[in-house]
A protein has these predicted regions:
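Juxtamembrane helix-boundary/capping and inter-helix hinge elements in multi-pass membrane proteins
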Residues: 15-16, 29, 105-109, 135-145
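Loop-to-transmembrane-helix entry motif
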Residues: 26-34, 64-68, 118, 128, ...
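Hydrophobic alpha-helical transmembrane segments of multi-pass integral membrane proteins
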Residues: 35-43, 48, 63-99, 103-104, ...
Length: 168
């Protein structure tokens, strides 16, 4: 980002003060969005916990250990797809479920990696994700068209990634 800023300064011959202001405005805006997502994920987890959904989810996984490795990646994947935010999905899952990984016979790193993969891939094909909306605008298509086009490869990536991460 800094290199790009310096190159744009040299090419456009803009005042350094104007470039600096734009650079730090952009950084602050991006940083604020990230903090907002993290806070929203924490509030979301609190809501899920308050409604008993987290306890029910953990109970279902404890009663059926065969689904744990699938839920560790598919749960955040679906959450990322529905919310358009892979970070919110991953933070929510890792805050609520991953601390219990050893109860499911997995390491925290293994379950956390599976959740990260799932959340990231879910956001990637979400028609309401910011990146999808921007790309659709550039291409002049509906965001759902991008989701349709990328759906099969992303689901295959989820399955392959889950398979390898589940091996431990």
């Amino acid at each position: 980002m800094i290199i790009g800023t310096l190159i744009s300064l040299a090419v456009t011959r803009t005042k350094p003060a104007d470039i600096g202001k734009a650079f730090f405005d952009g950084m602050g805006s991006a940083y604020g969005s990230i903090i907002g997502i993290i806070i929203a994920a924490g509030v979301f987890v609190s809501g899920l916990t308050a409604t008993g959904l987290v306890k029910a989810f953990i109970g279902a996984m404890l009663n059926n250990p065969a689904i744990v490795k699938i839920c560790a990646s598919v749960g955040p994947f679906l959450l990322g797809f529905l919310t358009g935010s892979g970070d919110a999905a991953t933070f929510a899952f890792n805050e609520a479920v991953t601390p219990h990984a050893q109860e499911f016979g997995m390491s925290i790193v293994q379950m956390g990696s599976m959740a990260t993969l799932g959340g990231t891939l879910g956001r990637t094909i979400s028609p309401i994700a910011g990146a999808t909306i921007i790309c659709a605008g550039f291409a002049g298509v509906n965001p759902v068209e991008i989701t349709k086009r990328n759906g099969i490869p992303i689901v295959l990536a989820l399955l392959v990634g889950t398979f390898f991460l589940a091996q431990g």
